[in-house]
Amino acid sequence: MRHLVWLLLLLAAPPALAKSPPRVDSAVYTDPVHDLAHPARMAVIHIPSGGVEINGVVYVAAGTGPHPVVVLCHGLPGNEKNLDLAQALRRAGWTVITFNYRGSWGSPGPYSFANDLADVDAVLAYARDPAHSQTLGLDPGRIVLGGHSLGGWATALTAAHDKGLAGAFMISPGNIGRFAKLPRAGAIEALRNNGMESLATTPEAMADELIAKGEAYDFVTAAPRLTGTRLLVLTSDDGGAPTADALVAGIRAAGGKSVTTAHAPTDHSWSDARLRLASEVIGWLRATR
């Protein structure tokens, strides 16, 4: 989404100020003790959604389960999948589910923003299914949803209606609903430049969907429905911080008191702040256990 974020500068206020970074969590750089009976492992899964099965990989934590779970959503198109973060979260004792939306990175079906949201719901349903939670050692009562960029947008809109989540975190969230305010030609060009090779759609179809949905895709409008959600919002110097700040302000104005925020002076992908990213998320997650 790196080619899109500059457009947010046209629709937003100045960026937030950075705070001091947290101490690097030991799980970022320390392997867990090898558990012969219950070793860390990977599992390939196929998640039913919209009449197809989307691709997923589970990073199962070491030790006797059930383990708390993070469902990690990638961005648009998803070049940065934050798998280093997934590994760090696993070392911290969380089992992490990663997946590819319909029509992206080999998952079958057409790509659309509506399908993104439906796919997130499908992954959560998969994790809560007793057959899968038992096989993978998941604790269905302790599922946290998180995402980067577009994945942060999907996280906000999903958490707004899924009250069974233990929490949610957003990393440099891209509020794609704001792009409905751009001229259609400008939105098409931005989407095309962002990289379409891995997506089963066209920039024209994506732009038309955004324009048709309008405010329904603006995550700031979800603020009143997030007041009871434990939420971590991480922003960066990518132009998108003001819309994330607006979401936080809206939640707090509506009475929400469980929002944690942090801002890092790095790019949209946190390219030079990977250890800080993992430490921010792990530190916040430790308080949910």
Spans of features found by a protein language model:
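Hydrolase active-site cap/lid region
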Residues: 19-25, 157-206
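N-terminal cap/lid segment of alpha/beta-hydrolase-fold proteins
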Residues: 20-64
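Active-site glycine-rich loops that stabilize anionic/oxyanionic intermediates
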Residues: 67, 74-78
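Structural cue for short, hydrophobic secondary-structure segments
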Residues: 72-75, 98
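Conserved alpha/beta-hydrolase
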Residues: 89-108
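Alpha/beta-hydrolase active-site loop
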Residues: 111-137
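Glycine-rich nucleophile elbow surrounding the catalytic serine of serine-hydrolase chemistry
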Residues: 146-157
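Serine-hydrolase catalytic core
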Residues: 209-279, 284-286
